[in-house]
């Protein structure tokens, strides 16, 4: 899909189709009023006749509107003007793209970016339109022998902005939106891959491929032999039951003018399949445990967006690749593991494995002398129970970092909700035999998991994002969502100090 931005009057557009909004009840937007005046009341007459109410998502395609150069005009219902918010705007864009494709439009000029969306500027409206369009067109059919013929003739979409001085803002929004969309697409492609293809080595290969196309990015890997030398016994224990080698992929991006600038470190849990190990999961829905690498998929997606935008910032990303399988070599409930930090962990349940991988990685990243560390993981079912599918769980003992991430979530629409990690919750992890257990019980499960991780992050500012409820959808629309790529990327854009809106 090709995107561009322009500033012009609707009646002068020679595009195959122009897209304008109509409010409820049958009220013309400013642009629609211009068209109505030029067409001598043609559009308002249709509305009075009841052809379109203006309810959100309603569509009416007009052909050969009098005195308008464009062949077609698509009227889009936008609901009540004062109630148009981010969620409704995205839904309208999605429905518009679907209608343009279904009606055979090859190109269109979209004036919906001139609508007033509460609290949002031109940059946000254009960028969100790009991301929403790209996400609505995504499909994963690489492994189907007979690929369906989806009708998608739309090739070019032009967004109109009110004034010429906003053209630069619009172009920047398209650039950023395309980068985030590319990152989300990579995240979804990697996460949707079946576990017989997407194993830790596959994750590493995807990162290496990215490194070959970016001068700023260097990719290395740490295998099991090197992990053993480093004392990463907890990480190694989780992967011991699998024939697929555990591989930690290290991606170092150096974009800052000052190469000595401390890096931001992103860590992604990369359990490419989680059977639960000896504490075997129920069979129903176990196929979705290929998505237990959703954290790593989100991190590699954010790195893709970072490379595409060439942000002036230093970032280290760790993809903690591993597979949790039952076998005679697998680790067991009752085992006591000595982590890379020297702290010991009593294993109560082998299905609480993500934290055992992450704790060693959180110790490993100390060598980068990080500015801060953000880990993201499909860590707990408890987070899904607490927050559902809409918000990711955010945990941090550092208020400024937590607020930065929450703001990035609000800006990008990839929202998170902060939960506490008070000292009282640490008591749930006490063990009579080791420094801690790997399971805090059913109450506050997402919180106690974050408390466990916090014990390995004393040397830097840290935040944990639990994406167990947001990284993928189940049911008929099963598949990766591409989250938390928008949140992480927005956080990096803000950190880099890159100009965005007006």
From Swiss-Prot:
One GO BP: proteolysis
InterPro entries on file: Leucine_aapep/pepB, Macro_dom-like, Peptidase_M17_C, Peptidase_M17_leu_NH2_pept, Peptidase_M17_N
EC number(s) recorded for this UniProt protein: 3.4.11.1, 3.4.11.10
Enzyme class: hydrolase
Presence of the UniProt keyword tRNA-binding in the record: no
SUPFAM superfamilies found in the cross-reference section: Macro domain-like (SSF52949), Zn-dependent exopeptidases (SSF53187)
Catalytic activity: Release of an N-terminal amino acid, Xaa-|-Yaa-, in which Xaa is preferably Leu, but may be other amino acids including Pro although not Arg or Lys, and Yaa may be Pro. Amino acid amides and methyl esters are also readily hydrolyzed, but rates on arylamides are exceedingly low; Release of an N-terminal amino acid, preferentially leucine, but not glutamic or aspartic acids
Residue numbers binding Mn(2+) 2: 269, 274, 292, 353
Example of a GO MF term: manganese ion binding
Required co-factors: Mn(2+)
Gene3D superfamilies recorded: Leucine Aminopeptidase, subunit E, domain 1, Zn peptidases
Localization terms from the record: Cytoplasm
Xref: Pfam families: Peptidase_M17, Peptidase_M17_N
Binding residues for Mn(2+) 1: 274, 351, 353
Active site: 281, 355
Main location per the UniProt record: cytoplasm
Cofactor binding notes: Binds 2 manganese ions per subunit.
Keywords from the named record: Aminopeptidase, Cytoplasm, Hydrolase, Manganese, Metal-binding, Protease
UniProt-listed HAMAP family: Cytosol_peptidase_M17 (MF_00181)
Function: Presumably involved in the processing and regular turnover of intracellular proteins. Catalyzes the removal of unsubstituted N-terminal amino acids from various peptides.
Name this polypeptide is given: Probable cytosol aminopeptidase
Organism: Shewanella sediminis (strain HAW-EB3)
